[in-house]
């Protein structure tokens, strides 16, 4: 059971992540704080939890009637870019969960495989996109998949009738990266849901004059766009703060 505000149950079957996000990455900060990893370089060498499928076989019968949706993943990436071993395991986890009549959601900065469209349940397939800029991606998500490749894989699943969503989080302030939010929204117009959230744990955010009003304005743009295009949405806590 996860404490993440839009989550239900979660499965994290890998320790670490080779995407090496530098926003900074909240999962890395927590793992380092509690002594699970020594440093950034260790975090970049992900390790599969070897008994994942055995644990899944034991846990699914216990929890399947309680689970509304099982999320992969909040502290790692289920379709880690250029890691076919992790991708294969994630697909098998999804197949077994669906076989137990448990719906799943996934969130990745990798490439969503087309095989996901063959799964029997109405799963929810998502990608993170906080900018359309490859230069920004290379600086802040150095090991992740190129932005357009992510979006194309999501659009292919959408074209095949799958439920798709995008997480625009953590969205940077203009002093970190200046961009056109509407352009980003229009590029992902085909999705069923958008989640929008501010950037935390980066002091540059508070150095931007009027940062809260900036996030308020961005959140309102997301809400307006979603309502105009019949897209469901969720604005993360502490992103939109009305006076």
Briefly describe each language-model feature range.
Residues 4-16, 138-140, 146-149, 196, ...:
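Non-transmembrane, interaction-prone segments in cytosolic or luminal domains
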Residues 6, 146, 162-164, 218-219, ...:
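Generic detector of bulky aromatic hydrophobic side chains
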Residues 17-19, 25, 33, 80, ...:
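Residues in flexible loops and secondary-structure boundaries
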Residues 51-221, 225:
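Conserved AdoMet/S-adenosylmethionine-binding subsite of the radical SAM
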Residues 1, 44-48, 116, 231-233, ...:
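Generic preference for hydrophobic/aromatic residues in regular secondary structure cores
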Residues 1-18, 22-69:
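N-terminal [4Fe-4S]-dependent radical SAM core
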Residues 108-110, 170, 228-243:
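Acidic carboxylate-rich catalytic motifs and surrounding loops in phosphoryl-/glycosyl-chemistry enzymes
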């Amino acid at each position: 059971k996860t404490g993440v505000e839009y989550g239900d149950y979660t499965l994290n079957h890998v320790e670490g992540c080779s995407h090496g996000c530098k926003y900074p990455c909240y999962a890395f900060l927590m793992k380092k704080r509690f002594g699970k990893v020594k440093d950034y370089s260790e975090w970049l060498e992900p390790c599969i939890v070897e008994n994942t499928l055995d644990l899944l076989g034991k846990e699914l019968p216990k929890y399947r009637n309680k689970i509304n949706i099982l999320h992969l993943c909040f502290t790692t990436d289920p379709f880690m870019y250029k890691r076919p071993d992790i991708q294969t395991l994630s697909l098998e986890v999804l197949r077994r969960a669906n076989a137990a009549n448990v719906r799943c959601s996934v969130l990745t900065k990798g490439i969503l495989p087309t095989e996901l469209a063959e799964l029997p349940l109405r799963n929810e397939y998502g990608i993170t996109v906080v900018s359309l800029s490859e230069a920004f991606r290379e600086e802040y998500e150095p090991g992740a998949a190129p932005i357009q490749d992510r979006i194309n894989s999501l659009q292919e699943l959408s074209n095949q009738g799958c439920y798709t969503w995008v997480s625009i989080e953590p969205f940077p302030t203009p002093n970190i990266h200046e961009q056109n939010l509407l352009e980003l929204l229009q590029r992902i117009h085909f999705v069923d849901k958008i989640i929008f959230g501010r950037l935390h744990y980066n002091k540059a955010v508070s150095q931007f004059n009027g940062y809260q009003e900036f996030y308020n304005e961005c959140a309102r743009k997301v809400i307006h766009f979603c309502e105009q295009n019949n897209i469901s949405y969720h604005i993360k806590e502490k992103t939109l703060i009305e006076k």
